[in-house]
Amino acid sequence: MLSLLKKGPSANKVPAEKIQATYGRYRMQALLSVFLGCLAYYIVRNNFTLSTPYLKEQLDLSATQIGLLSSCMLIAYGISKGVMSSLADKASPKVFMACGLVLCAIVNVGLGFSTAFWVFAALVVLNGLFQGMGVGPSFITIANWFPRRERGRVGAFWNISHNVGGGIVAPIVGAAFAILGTEHWQSASYIVPACVAVVFAISVLVLGKGSPREEGLPSLAEMMPEEKVVLKTKHGQKAPENMSAFQIFCTYVLRNKNAWYVSFVDVFVYMVRFGMISWLPIYLLTVKHFSKEQMSVAFLFFEWAAIPATLLAGWLSDKLFKGRRMPLAIICMTLIFICLIGYWKSESLLMVTVFAAIVGCLIYVPQFLASVQTMEIVPSFAVGSAVGLRGFMSYIFGASLGTSLFGVMVDKMGWHGGFYLLMGGIVCCILFCYLSHRGALELEQQRKITEQEEARLALADAQ
């Protein structure tokens, strides 16, 4: 099984006259494969949420038990993102991603035939563990095929797969219910999404690509000279082929202050995001006295406003900010701070909805920019490990702070305590955005010095 996940031998070299055309076609296929793959992971993750009313009614599970199941998946997913993303550095991205999808589908089929709570809990944990196999290959693929100047737009396109995947789960499950009927709720909730995921897994295998070299093409550094210096590291004397995934993680990520800075950016972004999304329904219903329909509209705006904002932010970070990601993240977090106060203090139904939509519009931008920054602070062969650290930190600490600690603050101090917590998280996020930006500028300066030194040596050799 493990041997199937390993990178295969390099393909025959593409003839020189076909390199440009092949390169352009392959990288579009690679991007589409990880977009579809990530989208499919959401189909076999978010379907669980849609099944919870039937779990409560048909299997007589309590709200506490359902909450425990959700927490199990969240924790397992956070741990898995850390471990699986590191392992992905040594694997074939398309095989790794497709394998994870198939395993998630198998688990969902198991959920469709389960009736005992503890069996459900075990399968939900397994689903969370296999879900972690989707993120690492996505970032590795983008880092392998797209230069720094394009990663903002490319990362933005890939990032909306989260929103699209989350958005099409309900129509898929709803159509299954319409065809099969509520008496077959387990098939509609679990088995149909599992079948859809398998179809997407096949598309990942067909469209997906390894690194350019594995596909018989020159590397990104050879195709685009400006990338050559970007990938240099002070540890470059040891070939990564001779290092295990753990050694790569320790050498290029664990000791890398910039990897920690960007991970803490994600921690506090997730804290604010989960604090808003987890508590928005109950806050609007009980404090702002929204109707269920009005709350649903506000929730819809919070989620879907992120798509145009993310695409615009990708273009701005590439073009206006010249590949520097954190200044835009700082601007977004500052605006979120202001809108959070408006969301909290406003009594107008319209204004509360508007402020919620703006927060939803902006909160995914720093998250996606942090993911792009991650690809630029480590060499391409360590991207999975860096993504793993970010994923572990964001889910285990960030999501927990936004859900559990927010609830504790509300119980102890009232709703204002929860909002003070989120405001503090925003301030901390801005601080780590600044530190991450400063670290990126230092790397940029080091790259320029290295480039100048190489040019000087080349000139000396020529003379």
Go through each PLM region and give its residues.
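Extracytoplasmic gate region of multi-pass secondary transporters
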Residues: 48-52, 255-311, 367, 371, ...
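Helix-breaking motifs and short loop linkers at transmembrane-helix boundaries and internal kinks
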Residues: 60, 92, 113-118, 289, ...
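Conserved MFS/SLC helix-loop-helix module at the cytosolic interface between two early adjacent transmembrane helices
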Residues: 79-118
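Helix-to-loop junctions at the C-terminal end of transmembrane segments
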Residues: 81-92, 310-322, 410
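Cytoplasmic membrane-interface "Motif A"-like loop-to-helix N-cap segments
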Residues: 90-101, 319-333
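Cytoplasmic helix-loop-helix junction between adjacent transmembrane helices
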Residues: 123-161
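Helix-loop-helix hairpin linking two adjacent transmembrane segments in secondary transporters
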Residues: 158-212
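C-terminal transmembrane helical hairpin of 12-TM major facilitator-type secondary transporters
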Residues: 323-370
